[in-house]
Amino acid sequence: MAPIPGVMPIGNYVSLYVMLPLGVVNADNVFPDKEKVEDELKQVKAGGCDGVMVDVWWGIIEAKGPKQYDWSAYRELFQLVKKCGLKIQAIMSFHQCGGNVGDAVFIPIPQWILQIGDKNPDIFYTNRAGNRNQEYLSLGVDNQRLFQGRTALEMYRDFMESFRDNMADFLKAGDIVDIEVGCGAAGELRYPSYPETQGWVFPGIGEFQCYDKYMVADWKEAVKQAGNADWEMPGKGAGTYNDTPDKTEFFRPNGTYKTDMGKFFLTWYSNKLIIHGDQVLEEANKVFVGLRVNIAAKVSGIHWWYNHVSHAAELTAGFYNVAGRDGYRPIARMLARHHATLNFTCLEMRDSEQPAEAKSAPQELVQQVLSSGWKEYIDVAGENALPRYDATAYNQMLLNVRPNGVNLNGPPKLKMSGLTYLRLSDDLLQTDNFELFKKFVKKMHADLDPSPNAISPAVLERSNSAITIDELMEATKGSRPFPWYDVTDMPVDGSNPFD
């Protein structure tokens, strides 16, 4: 259909969701504040938002024992969201709540899993010093039958199947539009390399998390197969959580990370993470195939030390991203196999807001990661990393959702599929803050009225054939990101291009 002169094409519309509070369903599996939440949801709806995102906690739903799922509180919540005319993005939260930036609630993974970990702590990610991290199960146990007859992947699958079956009415009605599948700490596809619970503070480089016995055994087999059985994982030369790159043998310029052994380790470490994501999303695709719903995975925004030659903080988190090697496009290629969306974070951040000593570059990181997704022809969505209520942050997010601006003749070539704002709170709903937020929502929608027709997921198709390591390696070849405008063409305090 030809564009109508003077009318903004609907293809410029970017859906806007708001994250619900972490404990909206509490640790006792109760939805306690129905009246308060209903009032807040009505304000969100009146503000023009399209929907909400909510963590669906494994530690709440399967708390009583294996396959003993209780969805009653979440059904109450979803019914209320539907009543208020909002769509739902549901996170399959297989991680612990608590221990990360912004966590004001504590919800552990199921207690019966933790009890297995008491006897076998190697089910958890482990650093070189032997410290265990109970936020999420090690990818080393993905296929280990250690959980009362099930593997970790089977537990994730069974949880998602139960969600699908118990929320079938919401899925069929189109109320649930996105399923974000947790693949690591904080629900992100990453290693828990920077845990505040173990003393990490920004901008520490973090530590590698591959010293549980299952990952160590995998490493030993990998180096043996490569004919280098004497190669070892990084030792103390990789430093500790709060080191800077230049203080370490591994990450300093021309450090161990550039040697053959260092490159082999980083390739192995990052590939294990991608394969983990691939296996989890394979299960998710099988569960939700044939439904009108998007599946997604979130990638962490490790923006500190991006401007250091070694990208140390990215490397410890599992993103092998250095000059001439793209650490994110292989992830996008893996997601493309499953018809999944790449969800990224730190969209609100500007380089100038970061401390110089952190060599942080969130703007360049966002540009690289979003470009990687678009080059693999997948949908890209995102969120802010920290709560912000100011025009500067909103305008940065508006720039990133349409990096080359609106297109008056149809959909822009570069456009994010949606943005989720972190987070619904009393601060957001404070009068002045919410008035500016409503302007932000309007600009996300390209000055169009809220449109349910803009949110219509296609039927999820079955995953494509398995991806080979060679195909992943081909995706690491560095290429320039797409160009970005310097500023958004639709600022919160400005007009639209038709005015």
Curated annotation (Swiss-Prot):
Catalytic residues in the record: E188, E383
The organism's place on the tree of life at top rank: Eukaryota
Binding site for substrate: D55, H95, D103, K298, H303, T345, N384, A385, R423
Any Pfam family: Glyco_hydro_14
The keyword Metal-binding appears for this protein: no
Molecular function, one GO term: beta-amylase activity
EC number: 3.2.1.2
Keywords (A to Z) from UniProt: Carbohydrate metabolism, Glycosidase, Hydrolase, Polysaccharide degradation
Residues spanning the signal sequence: none
Keyword Hydrolase in record: yes
pH dependence: Optimum pH is 5-6.
Catalysed reaction equations from the record: Hydrolysis of (1->4)-alpha-D-glucosidic linkages in polysaccharides so as to remove successive maltose units from the non-reducing ends of the chains
Temperature dependence: Optimum temperature is 50-55 degrees Celsius.
Biological processes per GO annotation: polysaccharide catabolic process
Family in the record: Belongs to the glycosyl hydrolase 14 family.
PANTHER family the UniProt entry points to: BETA-AMYLASE 1, CHLOROPLASTIC, BETA-AMYLASE 6
Protein name, per record: Beta-amylase
Source species taxonomy: Eukaryota, Viridiplantae, Streptophyta, Embryophyta, Tracheophyta
Gene: BMY1
